[in-house]
């Protein structure tokens, strides 16, 4: 079984629900005929909700992939609250008709997993990022860049499932979590990442490139060393007369003495 898609076609999280719906639908059909229609509708809905199709995975090492299906609701410069650094934030909102299986956006090593309890407001709202129940995965890419991807519960989705932990290595496109019935995923990338999507765009999990992240961080240019200040010659004042000035004063004194001698004669 493919390691990147260990639960082909239908996510394992839906097996009990789909199995129960199918059994109940068959039972009601045998007993009540057309009265079983609502149960069949529910079973079909569960089948489409828990679908988990395999997708082509772009292998460009600079490509950061969308971890889920959905619609882009945020593309902005923001503060990564888990690392306390400036970041490029990209948020994806999932409605009940999207695939809700979450997959790794890059080849990376998980460094930390942070779970926060919270509310269950509409995941389409910006405040859901800070107020709702959420689970953040902090990771370092194969090239050493730090990224953060956050599972955010929604108004209906009240169960975040995360199957990874600190120290785990994830391949791009590898399944790591699931959120049931509508939710949101926030991505925090280094500020030099270049967004490839805009607000309102629809994205497909692991097949859509959200951003391009250079393999190396930009070099911070060091400030040039300041040149030593030029030494200026001391300003000559009356207290420090020049040789020329002393000669002039000496000649003037001789002339004055000669004039006085003439006057005495």
Curated annotation (Swiss-Prot):
UniProt xrefs under Pfam families: PS_Dcarbxylase
Catalytic residues of the enzyme: 183 (schiff-base intermediate with substrate)
Listed EC numbers: 4.1.1.65
Region (Disordered): 218-242
Keywords from the named record: Cell membrane, Decarboxylase, Lipid biosynthesis, Lipid metabolism, Lyase, Membrane, Phospholipid biosynthesis, Phospholipid metabolism, Pyruvate, Zymogen
Localization (cell): Cell membrane
Site (Cleavage (non-hydrolytic)): 182-183
Catalytic activity: a 1,2-diacyl-sn-glycero-3-phospho-L-serine + H(+) = a 1,2-diacyl-sn-glycero-3-phosphoethanolamine + CO2
Post-translational modification: Is synthesized initially as an inactive proenzyme. Formation of the active enzyme involves a self-maturation process in which the active site pyruvoyl group is generated from an internal serine residue via an autocatalytic post-translational modification. Two non-identical subunits are generated from the proenzyme in this reaction, and the pyruvate is formed at the N-terminus of the alpha chain, which is derived from the carboxyl end of the proenzyme.
Gene Ontology CC: one annotated term: plasma membrane
InterPro entries assigned to the protein according to its UniProt record, in alphabetical order: PS_Dcarbxylase, PSD-A
Membrane topology, record value: Peripheral membrane protein
One Gene Ontology molecular-function label: phosphatidylserine decarboxylase activity
Chief localisation class: membrane
Cofactor binding summary note: Binds 1 pyruvoyl group covalently per subunit.
Lipid biosynthesis keyword on record: yes
NCBIfam families: AS_decarb (TIGR00164), PRK05305.1-2 (NF003678), PRK05305.1-5 (NF003680)
HAMAP family in the record: PS_decarb_PSD_A
Protein name: Phosphatidylserine decarboxylase proenzyme
Origin species: Neisseria meningitidis serogroup C (strain 053442)
